[in-house]
Amino acid sequence: MVSNIDHKAMEALLRGQGCANNLKILLENGEISSVSTEPLIHTILDSFSLALSFMDSPNHPPYHESSSHNMASHMSRRSSKQVQHRRKLCVAEGLVNYNHDSRTMCPNDGFTWRKYGQKTIKASAHKRCYYRCTYAKDQNCNATKRVQKIKDNPPVYRTTYLGKHVCKAFAVHDDTYSSTMIRFDQVVPEPIMPQLTTIDHQVITVEENSAEHIMNQECDINDYLVDDDPFWASQFPPFPSSDTMFLENISAFD
């Protein structure tokens, strides 16, 4: 008979074993980076520490060889099934999943993402947001991630990455809050005069989903809002009568 504490310790060990298997896959594929390996290493160490704390608990029942043997055999059967299932998924779909905790909701991880949904979690006061790679359709990239706030003070966001990127497009700017297909790059002109206020000057880049080309359309509106005040009268006084006659004489030669 497996006690409640033994069951919790077993779950912690299985969680650590799962992260160890994911770490092994990353090492075999040569995808070694601090972003991908550090969360897995921390989870493995935390899982073993948690399991040891359960085993050292004063409420833990005394050691019996039969119960220990049953627990070990149960863990062996369950872990074997999980390893086989995960191995099939990884081989068939090339999945790589791991967690990453950060102080920001969407840290710059080198890829662009598009949010496609969110839902309320019963055990949490914060909603879970779901993202997919921006190039999921264009380049058949099946990488996704979900982000959820797990702590308030200080704020900590947990990002769970699922799938493996096959796209070759890396993010240039940290714009993962809203990975949209239309980007507006603001161009602020130098002010000509304090009384001139530019209406708009934008370069709009539209990325077509159905085409492989990018159409650049530049909208440059050189219209200005002019304040009606005595400033213009002082800056541009009216022509005197002599200058007017001079201009009329010049126009007579044309």
From Swiss-Prot:
Looking up InterPro entries in the UniProt record yields: WRKY_dom, WRKY_dom_sf, WRKY_plant
- Annotated TM spans: none
Extent of the signal sequence: none
Per the record, the major location class is nucleus
Q: Organism's domain of life?
A: Eukaryota
Keywords of the record, alphabetical order, are: DNA-binding, Nucleus, Transcription, Transcription regulation
The compartments listed are: Nucleus
Q: Which residues bind DNA?
A: 102-170
Pfam families noted in UniProt? WRKY
Q: Which GO terms describe its cellular component?
A: nucleus
Which GO MF terms does the UniProt record name? DNA-binding transcription factor activity; sequence-specific DNA binding
- What is the role of the protein in this entry? Transcription factor. Interacts specifically with the W box (5'-(T)TGAC[CT]-3'), a frequently occurring elicitor-responsive cis-acting element.
Q: What is this protein called?
A: Probable WRKY transcription factor 67
Q: Which organism is it from?
A: Arabidopsis thaliana (Mouse-ear cress)
